[in-house]
């Protein structure tokens, strides 16, 4: 995994990869499903969608590092922000999404892709939530595309 850090640092001319947690880096590099990555890219390109991070990873990684992770799969250009880390709705990530939307009233269409916080997202964002149980599969992609095209 140390070799992976060196390889990515050289490939992207970015020494930040040398300081990244090697297990997180390996998870992004090896474990992200290529088909799911392509589906996410397709959503971004087809619908001119942007990615706003609400992942728990933002709790210990700044946005610049998250972009570096996404860069490995050429998705960094779609990352435009992150939700605030303010706990509302009983410490739910859905509350953070609500705050982000309140702070960005120009957003008229959005989809939430998540593998957790199901109860809260289904309660507060039933029309925008796509539960990705394991990866962004074809059925979940179709649901997300339908939401973004409505």
Identify the meaning behind each predicted range.
Residues 1-87:
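Alpha-helical substrate-recognition element adjacent to the catalytic core
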Residues 64-150:
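C-terminal cap/substrate-recognition subdomain and adjoining C-terminal extension
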């Amino acid at each position: 995994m140390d070799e992976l850090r060196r390889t990515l640092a050289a490939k992207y001319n970015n020494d930040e990869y040398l300081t990244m947690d090697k297990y997180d880096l390996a998870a992004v590099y090896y474990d992200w499903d290529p088909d799911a990555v392509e589906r996410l890219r397709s959503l971004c390109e087809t619908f001119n969608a942007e990615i706003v991070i609400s992942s728990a990873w933002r709790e210990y990684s700044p946005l610049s590092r998250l972009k570096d992770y996404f860069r490995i799969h050429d998705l960094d250009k779609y990352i435009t922000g992150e939700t605030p880390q303010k706990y509302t709705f009983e410490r739910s990530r859905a509350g953070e999404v609500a705050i982000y939307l309140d702070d960005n009233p120009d957003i008229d269409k959005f989809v939430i892709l998540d593998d957790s916080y199901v109860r809260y997202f289904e309660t507060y964002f039933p029309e925008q939530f796509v539960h990705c149980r394991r990866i962004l599969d074809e059925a979940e992609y179709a649901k997300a595309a339908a939401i973004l095209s409505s």
